[in-house]
């Protein structure tokens, strides 16, 4: 299973879909467009 937006995570693969695990916040975020 995976975790959704703004849910605590340890690595990118913890997050659903294209979400990434933010190293700053330690939760899943949408990838930066930049």
Curated annotation (Swiss-Prot):
Q: Which cysteines are joined by disulfide bonds?
A: 2-16, 9-21, 15-28
Which tissue types show expression of this protein? Expressed by the venom gland.
Q: Is Disulfide bond set as a keyword in this record?
A: yes
GO CC, any one term: extracellular region
MF terms (GO), sorted A to Z: ion channel inhibitor activity; toxin activity
State where the protein is found.
Secreted
Q: Which domain of life is it from?
A: Eukaryota
Q: Which Pfam families match?
A: Toxin_12
Instruction: Report whether Secreted shows up as a keyword of the record.
Output: yes
UniProt keyword list: Disulfide bond, Knottin, Neurotoxin, Secreted, Toxin
Transmembrane regions listed in the UniProt entry: none
What protein family is recorded?
A: Belongs to the neurotoxin 10 (Hwtx-1) family. 03 (BsTX5) subfamily.
Domain topic, free-text comment: The presence of a 'disulfide through disulfide knot' structurally defines this protein as a knottin.
Q: What is this protein called?
A: U2-theraphotoxin-Bs1a
Protein source organism:
Brachypelma smithi (Mexican red knee tarantula)
């Amino acid at each position: 299973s995976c975790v959704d937006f703004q849910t605590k995570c340890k690595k990118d693969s913890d997050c659903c879909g294209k979400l990434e695990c933010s190293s700053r916040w330690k939760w899943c975020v949408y990838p930066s467009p930049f």
